[in-house]
Amino acid sequence: MALGLKCFRMVHPTFRNYLAASIRPVSEVTLKTVHERQHGHRQYMAYSAVPVRHFATKKAKAKGKGQSQTRVNINAALVEDIINLEEVNEEMKSVIEALKDNFNKTLNIRTSPGSLDKIAVVTADGKLALNQISQISMKSPQLILVNMASFPECTAAAIKAIRESGMNLNPEVEGTLIRVPIPQVTREHREMLVKLAKQNTNKAKDSLRKVRTNSMNKLKKSKDTVSEDTIRLIEKQISQMADDTVAELDRHLAVKTKELLG
């Protein structure tokens, strides 16, 4: 207790007054910067309010068993010279948006011309979207036409890309015109789309892991100039952001699965 009071007195008066006036649960951690030079290390001290124990009900205890209930909320501006957390957050959000876009454009019960637009076709100039090298139109509710007259040399590659798109399509070719019959909506077709949705979600999680790994690697580059406690706190923030993003990806998958299965 005496040691605690001594440490409390050592805190800058501004922070001490703030702490005395603002008693909050220890779970609400705010990063405050105190610029000190100790052995060449910058110290980013994390000050939390006086700990208050919250007595949970049995139900709440059971729900939280085995899970860490402490969350951090670092002010990105205070650590921007170490890592740009706002940029990391935007990269994680882009993973979610890419999955949502994929779901909306390629995973629909009824195949539409728009579903074929972004199919990647391997050409001599690299991968191009199908709508960049063709004209796609709906001839009837049961048939989509893909006109390859502008890039006839890419016809075979376009057929291959459509067939391997995972949308259960079997294109037929007549010269430079590709006919794409729209499959009937069967239970098997619905389940196939759900399987594809899960695969795309797993790919999104792979992309998210890359964002997290790259962020952690950037953070480690500062270990010689920033305290270990600060590094660990920022690592926890990044992991927390990644976990929240995974939960969001799973939520979108659940919604899409329900939509596809009817």
UniProtKB/Swiss-Prot annotation:
Residues 1-55 form a transit peptide. One of its GO terms (molecular function) is ribosomal large subunit binding. Gene3D superfamilies: 3.30.1360.40, Ribosome-recycling factor. It is found in: Mitochondrion. It comes from the Eukaryota. GO terms for biological process: ribosome disassembly; translation. Keywords: Mitochondrion, Protein biosynthesis, Transit peptide. SUPFAM superfamilies: Ribosome recycling factor, RRF. GO terms for cellular component: mitochondrial matrix; mitochondrion. InterPro entries: Ribosome_recyc_fac, Ribosome_recyc_fac_dom, RRF_sf. Responsible for the disassembly of ribosomes from messenger RNA at the termination of mitochondrial protein biosynthesis. Acts in collaboration with GFM2. Promotes mitochondrial ribosome recycling by dissolution of intersubunit contacts. Belongs to the RRF family. This is Ribosome-recycling factor, mitochondrial. The lineage of its organism: Eukaryota, Metazoa, Chordata, Craniata, Vertebrata. The gene is MRRF.
